[in-house]
Structures are given as structure tokens and as C-alpha cells.
Amino acid sequence: EEQALIVMERLQPHIILRQQTMEGRKVEGLGKRMGLFAARTAFRGSDLSMAAPDKKADTALFAGNVELCDITESLVFTDPYYDAEMNRHTTPQLDGIVAELRADEALKVEVQHMKRAFTSRGETMCHGDLHAGSIMVTSDEARVIDPEFAFYGPFGFDIGMLIGNYLMAYHAMPAHISDAGACKDYQEWILSVIEETWSVYCAEFLR
């Protein structure tokens, strides 16, 4: 009987980044590290770095990850824009915003353009689930985990998902930090992480 063995590094004392942000803890160098990771992943898994036969073989290797790609397709590009069974939001506080989003035809058209790119543009290997729950950190280090959503997709997917998740954390901070001054300070730190992540990503990808 064919068997397999997985060897994993024990990441200790690393903590999931989402937990760190919810507790208002800053991570030194986070923007630089994640910008480098996203840029190098995007470049090295693409035709810009790989020989054509290797890229085609790698694309075929990940083409079978249909079930997990379908989860992303539904949760990101489909379900938020109608009353899907799994949707939840704080009611009645967010009812108006949800109704406005679902009635925005122009937005839904743009989302469909992005969905088409997600399903049809195999430009590079993407982590596929790059958010604060897939990053483990210490006060000065970051490691990316959970690669099971990996697939070949558009260049902008990973970096877009990461920045979008940072923005969600930004808007959620008042629920986690009650002191207005401390909350504002942490939100400004999140914005600085976004800025550094993007600038490092662009510089590394283009160098």
C-alpha cells in the first residue's frame, strides 16, 4: 500500500497574525516580509521565471485543486452579492450596507470581471488564501502557512487578498481596542503595513 510522509516545521513561539491584530500587537517588519513573499511567489511561479515546459507541468499539477478553488470562487466572487445560505451579518446594524451592496449593479459587473480573471488567467502560482489567518508571526518574524488553496491564477490575486484582509482588520479595530487613541494608533500602523507591503511588492517584482 502506497503511503506518504509529511515533515513540518514546528513554528514556536509564532502566533497567528489575526490573533496578534485582534490584541493590538504590532509586528516589526511585517510589510516588508509579506511584500517580499508575495512578489517572489508571483514572479517565480510565472513565465517570467519558469521555462515554458516547467510552467505547463506545474499548472497541470495544481489544476486538480478544484474543490478548494470553488470555495474561494463562491465566498469571494459570488455569495456576498446575494442572500446566500451561508451569509451572516450583524443585523439590523449592517442591513442598509448589505442591501446597498447587493443592489449595486455596477459593482457586481466589476466583480464578475474579477471572477473571470480568477477562473481563467493562470499567470502564476498563487497561495490562494493569503490572509491574517494564514500568517504566523513573532514580534519580528513572519511565516506563511496553509498552502492547501494553492492554484495557478492572476498575478494580483494574493497581494489583493492580503491588502483586502488588512483593510478588514483596520475597520474591525474599534471592536477590539476600546481606547480611541490606542485604536487610532494601531489603525495607522495597519495603513503603514499596507503601504510598505505594496511598495516592497512592486520594487521586488520589478527589480
Residue map of PLM features:
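Short beta-strand micro-motifs within the conserved protein kinase catalytic domain, predominantly
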Residues: 1-5
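ATP-dependent phospho-/nucleotidyl transfer catalytic cores
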Residues: 15-127, 138
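Conserved catalytic-loop position in the HRD/HxD motif
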Residues: 129, 146
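Active-site activation/catalytic loop segments of kinase-like enzymes and analogous catalytic loops
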Residues: 156-206
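Short pocket-lining segment of the protein kinase catalytic domain that shapes the ATP-binding cleft
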Residues: 6-14
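Conserved protein kinase catalytic/activation segment
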Residues: 134-144
